[in-house]
């Protein structure tokens, strides 16, 4: 039985770092484990131009622990009125590495998102031309579509057509949650990749609803039936090269989760690697963990892999019920549980 696992330092290809006091409280957890992270732009107001994204990057760098080598990889928030030249300039100058498509009202901070993907086709055509990745929250938002079906309907109605119209556009189908999404990505061409969160590998929708409403298991896209969780585990641990680590860590204050209308999002950053490696251990795929965590993402984003290493060891670690993040109480994923792996050297 493997007792230690040494891998290249991973990257997290989907994080929410928030801003101000909460940013300062949560960013150390990501920076401790990961060399780089794709930072979501859905602040209030959202990061819709070069100047705003650059200023946010500066705030993240200022919030890092002293001596940290962590690099935030920034993204642009797309709207119906996004300027094509602003997109091209920010990408060329290295201010952001990708653009994020939120269908309007699909999730937290998406009110300014795109109302119809055809509205931004000229922007997407420019992105295809310059090789800029598009990151997609893949759900429809029609009120008549069941929340558990929104990802599958998005594939059928929007994503399939987009890929046909722009076959060279580099797309990351983020935080996939369904068997349909796993099959779509596996069957697509080399321009399509996906991220998978730790929660969607560990829990199904029962975690939210059995024995009472469990707000800390609520995120968007919501966890689905057990067959979907199993399909995601199969894909993540298969060695498939176009799927990679993206936590979608989404911190919210405890009292905002435990409310009549609680926020969507799971704060998984503090024990992200421990959570992921547990899945690979359970699936007998520890030999494939480095590819998922450290190699596949850089390959898709056309970035070098990290040279330094991180060591994980088989040893119990207790996850606290609550974490004080610079004055904000936040409940982490796996709260109150004991995980079987921990970071030995980072």
From Swiss-Prot:
Gene3D superfamilies: Metal-dependent hydrolases. It comes from the Bacteria. CDD domains: DHOase (cd01294). The active site is at 248. Pfam families: Amidohydro_1. One of its GO terms (cellular component) is cytosol. Disulfide bonds: none annotated. Binds 2 Zn(2+) ions per subunit. Its cofactor is Zn(2+). The modification N6-carboxylysine is found at residue 100. Catalyzes the reversible cyclization of carbamoyl aspartate to dihydroorotate. Belongs to the metallo-dependent hydrolases superfamily. DHOase family. Class II DHOase subfamily. This is Dihydroorotase. The gene is pyrC.
């Amino acid at each position: 039985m493997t007792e230690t696992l040494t891998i290249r330092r991973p990257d997290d290809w989907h994080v929410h770092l928030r801003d101000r006091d909460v940013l300062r409280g949560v960013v150390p957890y990501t920076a401790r484990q990961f060399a780089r992270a794709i930072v979501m732009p859905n602040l209030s107001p959202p990061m819709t131009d070069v100047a705003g994204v650059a200023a946010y990057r500066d705030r993240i760098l200022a919030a890092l622990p002293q001596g940290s080598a962590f690099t935030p990889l920034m993204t642009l928030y797309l709207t119906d009125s996004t300027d094509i030249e602003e997109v091209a300039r920010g990408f060329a100058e290295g201010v952001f590495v990708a653009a994020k498509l939120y269908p309007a009202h699909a999730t937290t901070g998406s009110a300014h998102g795109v109302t119809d993907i055809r509205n931004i086709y000229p922007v997407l055509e420019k992105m295809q031309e310059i090789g800029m990745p598009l990151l997609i929250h893949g759900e429809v938002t029609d009120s008549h579509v069941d929340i558990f079906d929104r990802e599958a309907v998005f594939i059928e109605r929007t994503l399939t057509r987009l890929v046909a119209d722009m076959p060279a556009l580099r797309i990351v189908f983020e935080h996939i949650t369904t068997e349909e999404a796993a099959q779509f990505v596996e069957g697509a061409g080399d321009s399509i990749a996906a991220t998978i969160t730790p929660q969607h590998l560990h829990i199904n929708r029962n975690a939210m609803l059995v024995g009472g409403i469990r707000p800390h298991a609520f995120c968007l896209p919501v966890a689905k039936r057990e067959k979907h969780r199993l399909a995601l585990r199969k894909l993540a641990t298969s060695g498939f090269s176009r799927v990679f680590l993206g936590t979608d860590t989404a911190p919210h204050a405890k009292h905002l989760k435990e409310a009549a209308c609680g926020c969507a999002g799971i704060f998984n950053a503090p024990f992200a690697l421990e959570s992921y490696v547990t899945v690979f251990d359970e699936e007998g795929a520890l030999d494939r963990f480095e590819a998922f965590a450290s190699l596949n993402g850089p390959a898709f984003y056309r970035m070098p892999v990290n040279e330094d290493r991180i060591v994980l060891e088989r040893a119990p670690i207790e996850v606290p019920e609550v974490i004080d993040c610079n004055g904000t109480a936040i409940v982490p994923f796996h709260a109150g549980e004991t995980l079987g792996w921990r970071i030995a050297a980072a």
